[in-house]
Amino acid sequence: MGANSAAGQNSGSDSPKLILIHLDAVSVPVLRAEIDAGNMPNIKRIFNEEGLLETAITYYPSKTPFIISNIRDGTSSSTGELVGWDIPGFDYGKDLSIEDSFLKMALSKQRISRANLLQGLPFFSGLKDLALMNTLDLFDDYPVQEFYWYKADSYGHFEGEEEYLRKVRQFDERIGKYIDKLDDDINIIIYSDHGMVFGEGVELNKQINNRFSDEVKVYSYPTMYLKEGVDEETTAKRVVNETDLDFAFFLQDRMTAKGFFENSTLYFEYQDGKIRYRHDGPDPFDYFDNGYNGEFLTADEWLSLTIELDYPATPVKVFAFLQNPNAGEIVTSLDNTKFNKTGYSQMGNHGGFTATDVVVPVMVRGPDVGYIGEFDKLWLQELFNELDQFTFKQEPNRDTHYISSRYDFSTNTNRTVAAYSPAYRFRLGADIDFGDFNGADLNQVWGKYDIVRSQLARVWIGGGVDFSRTDTVGMFMVRHEFRIRNFSAKTSITTNKNNQFTLAYDIHDNFSLELTNFSAVGFRLSL
């Protein structure tokens, strides 16, 4: 635990501890193939005998903003708000652009985990490993932590399957080292939000814009929003016939979803909490060849029957999403041989309802969560319903108080700083100088507020009064802290030019040695 933590100050510090790791874009078929090939020795060692659930199914649409923003509350796909990246008004009262959706998704996360989004980009990906290891020191401040591993997703989109698999294997290496350092009483859950489809890249947005500009208001794969007065059935059929999309569904009436695939017409009929599937033409899902007899089934029955097929529980997923007031009038999907090619997703993508998109692993270990690995099946949106004993988004009651002292050999002065934290994210302090150890002068008083915190860094802004000059003056300050386990680097910039750069090393939970401006040596005691 770092000396900057607020150890013991969290009202939930006696609650069970949990690290919840969101492993982006790894489906069960990929994970199982990598385990069987011997490429995931740590996952196999830690989870394969018990604790690896391979029969979980995620949301449709299998898109990151929809899943992240809804899963914590156990929200179903029929009611979740953030259904895609680009959304017309509906329940929001205004259109949501890609930038709006990204911000809403980021703000739905635990505060210290939001920077994981940037760390998933190739340019910043080197910080991801450091951030993960830093979570080991944050459990006293945050008994329940969330961590988002985006590397596989980002590299799958940008670089393709080979680099994607390298990042999946890299996760195995990193998680092995991490769990070996994790205390046995700390629970861990690793879940994936969706898979990643490679193959032929097809530019669906260009196809829709070129051929359906008169009918379609917005297309954000897999959802299609139509202009007023456009016939849904005619458009859905044309979409399948005139684009690379394989499936298109719409609500024929309140109880029936109708769709098209090549020369087949497909129906999902709802009655008394159950759904029946029927088709005119070939069965693209192969349900009737695998034990289905045309009866009405519950959602769980559909999942049990189809979890090992190419299109698991598709009737449930499509019908549920079409009930969502923010969904488009038509919902679509590619098969697992093609992906939607965009500016961001040049080499791979996801979002549809194939097994490669939606069958995801859940890995668990720990005294309070181990039983989840024994489930026969799991709808991913129900995962958080199993975690009622954990409190998410809790924060410390306050930050640490501290006293620091350092001797500056260039000026022969000793400076002592006393800081008090009345509440979390606030600190008040005073700097006192002792010249030649004879007498004391109040140098400055200050207050600061934490505006950014991640697993790696913290940024404070504040102000105060400088008494060291002939004329007392006010000052503004910005302070940045960067931490890697026991080592930290701190930069303080002030308008009174009392700028500082400090390197620190924690030799105990509450005690660190410091070097400031490469001329002053001292210590810091946290309380």
Language model: regions and residue ranges:
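A long, amphipathic alpha-helix that forms part
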Residues: L136, Q145-F147, D153-I189, T234, ...
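Short glycine/proline- and aromatic-enriched beta-strand/turn motifs that initiate or cap beta-hairpins
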Residues: K393-F437
